[in-house]
UniProtKB/Swiss-Prot annotation:
This is Hemagglutinin. Palmitoylated. In natural infection, inactive HA is matured into HA1 and HA2 outside the cell by one or more trypsin-like, arginine-specific endoprotease secreted by the bronchial epithelial cells. One identified protease that may be involved in this process is secreted in lungs by club cells. One of its GO terms (biological process) is virion attachment to host cell. Coiled coil: none annotated. Residues 1-16 form the signal peptide. The gene is HA. Glycans are attached at N26, N27, N39, N181, N302, N500.
Length: 568
């Protein structure tokens, strides 16, 4: 009879109403890394590293770049005859120069402080070319014969368009004294040069005077140049050399030239009409008729991500360059579908990765929620409040990370002349060091935030579990797997009250107490029955053993195998 009662009690326990706390799972295979683990599969993740570009040169915020094609910056500014398409250029967003442009200084020589001039251009968006000393004004000098086969144009000798190579006229080279006053409101870029002949014969042939000089002065510049006559190997068919110089003439300032030979005079100058962020970018790409906010030598980036790994040199509103190959932020939960039935490592709070062994793919409308079963059926229901708070929290955190990191960031190349190689090497080492620090910071940030996000989800599930536990108290039994088994009947209305936090503990406490005591009584009665049976079994076994020993002894005494002596 006791066994039948026990069996009925067990059956009734199996059919008891239950409510479980759980979390969302899906078919996602996205993985993230944390401080403690690698390749953690999560339900949702967000990539914050841009790895793609369009492979084109694009307008930057609607403004076209100045693509110099086969011309260098020097060829453009001095007016190499092969660069006539750049005689007048509109506003540019950035300048593109090939690594080794064919049309540079056609007449061999050097451009003084060339790298510094390029740095100036990286803060300029528009030049306006103006004539400052007309070519026709050199009545006492030959301003037409100063051409060279090194600078051909349509098969004939020519020269730079923006400067004038002055030669003697009628066997005389009178001393030049010229001035130009900058009456413009803008700064003016002025260029001039000096010719270094191959020998003394060439010197007198071109300039008549054997000893010459060039003097240039402004309010901030005091320069005196003399030609260096020397025998040199031919470059572009020329043994002579030309050296070019430049200065920025401020408004209301004047520039004065004095020379008795070897003078390359300015005809045109460049009015700096607009200053702003620009860059000189080394690239072999072609124009792609596109628009972007961020340009690299590899192509344009159109992305809202805070990091990229495409190229360290950029112009525009760009993500920060890092050397990483993967930066993924966890936004969802650990993805542990219940069917896997395997225990994961514990998180900080141990909820998702601890006593709740698997997520629910059937719960699709929230991150956390409930599964109930009673006589009316079973089903999943998301906890909208905790889910929305979690979504808001994670979204705000991701946006905050992106906002903090996704500031305007430009990294343009710096150029150094041959005398500055040690500075260039030091600059490269510093830039590499900065990139290493940025990369380390970005990777560490992602690892820490992923750990915090997953623990945040663990904590939310634990909080939801505690919310239910505190409501039910002893009206239900904790099963240890995230579920509670009611000691009373709990219909759908009762289940809903547990979910929304309005469960009426006193209403069900009496029924729960009676059922709890009945179950406890069955257990105790069963335990007592088994104890009595155990005692009876022990006594009976001992008595049977004693009888067997006595019978064996009498039999052995009767056949002489055992001698029995009774002493009184």
């Amino acid at each position: 009879m006791e066994k039948i009662v026990l069996l009925l009690a067990i059956v009734s326990l199996v059919k008891s109403d239950q409510i479980c706390i759980g979390y969302h799972a899906n078919n996602s295979t996205e993985q993230v890394d944390t401080i403690m683990e690698k390749n953690v599969t999560v339900t949702h993740a967000q990539d914050i590293l841009e790895k793609t570009h369009n492979g084109k040169l694009c307008d930057l915020n609607g403004v076209k770049p100045l693509i110099l094609r086969d011309c260098s910056v020097a060829g453009w500014l001095l007016g190499n005859p092969m660069c006539d398409e750049f005689i007048n250029v509109p506003e540019w967003s950035y300048i593109v120069e090939k690594a080794s442009p064919a049309n540079d200084l056609c007449y061999p020589g050097d451009f003084n402080d060339y790298e510094e001039l390029k740095h100036l251009l990286s803060r300029t968006n528009h030049f306006e070319k103006i004539q400052i000393i007309p070519k026709s004004s050199w009545s006492n000098h030959d301003a037409s014969s100063g051409v060279s086969s090194a600078c051909p144009y349509h098969g004939r000798s020519s020269f730079f368009r923006n400067v004038v190579w002055l030669i003697k006229k009628n066997s005389a080279y009178p001393t030049i004294k010229r001035s130009y006053n900058n009456t413009n409101q803008e700064d003016l870029l002025v260029l001039w040069g000096i010719h270094h002949p191959n020998d003394a014969a060439e010197q007198t042939k071109l300039y008549q005077n054997p000893t010459t000089y060039i003097s240039v002065g402004t309010s901030t510049l005091n320069q005196r140049l003399v030609p260096e006559i020397a025998t040199r190997p031919k470059v572009n068919g020329q043994s002579g050399r030309m050296e070019f110089f430049w200065t920025i003439l401020k408004p209301n300032d004047a520039i004065n030239f004095e020379s008795n030979g070897n003078f390359i005079a300015p005809e045109y100058a460049y009015k700096i009409v607009k200053k702003g962020d620009s860059a000189i970018m080394k690239s072999e790409l072609e124009y792609g008729n596109c628009n972007t906010k961020c340009q690299t030598p590899m192509g344009a980036i159109n992305s809202s991500m805070p990091f990229h790994n495409i190229h360290p040199l950029t112009i525009g509103e760009c993500p920060k360059y890092v050397k990483s190959n993967r930066l993924v932020l966890a936004t969802g939960l650990r993805n542990t579908p219940q069917r896997e039935r395997r225990r994961k490592k514990r998180g900080l709070f141990g909820a998702i990765a601890g006593f709740i062994e698997g997520g629910w793919q059937g719960m699709v409308d929230g991150w956390y929620g409930y599964h109930h079963s009673n006589e009316q059926g079973s089903g999943y229901a998301a906890d909208k409040e905790s889910t929305q708070k979690a979504i808001d929290g994670v979204t705000n955190k991701v946006n905050s990370i992106i906002d903090k990191m996704n500031t305007q960031f430009e990294a343009v190349g710096r150029e150094f002349n041959n005398l500055e190689r040690r500075i260039e090497n030091l600059n490269k080492q510093m830039e590499d060091g900065f990139l290493d620090v940025w990369t380390y910071n970005a990777e560490l940030l992602v690892l820490m935030e992923n750990e915090r996000t997953l623990d945040f989800h663990d904590s939310n599930v634990k909080n939801l579990y505690d919310k239910v536990r505190l409501q039910l108290r002893d009206n239900a039994k904790e099963l240890g797997n995230g579920c509670f088994e009611f000691y009373h009947k709990c219909d759908n209305e009762c289940m809903e009250s547990v979910k929304n936090g309005t469960y009426d503990y006193p209403q069900y406490s009496e029924e729960a107490r009676l059922n709890r005591e009945e179950i406890s009584g069955v257990k105790l009665e069963s335990m007592g029955t088994y104890q009595i049976l155990s005692i009876y079994s022990t006594v009976a076994s001992s008595l049977a053993l004693a009888i067997m020993v006595a019978g064996l002894s009498l039999w052995m005494c009767s056949n002489g195998s055992l001698q029995c002596r009774i002493c009184i």
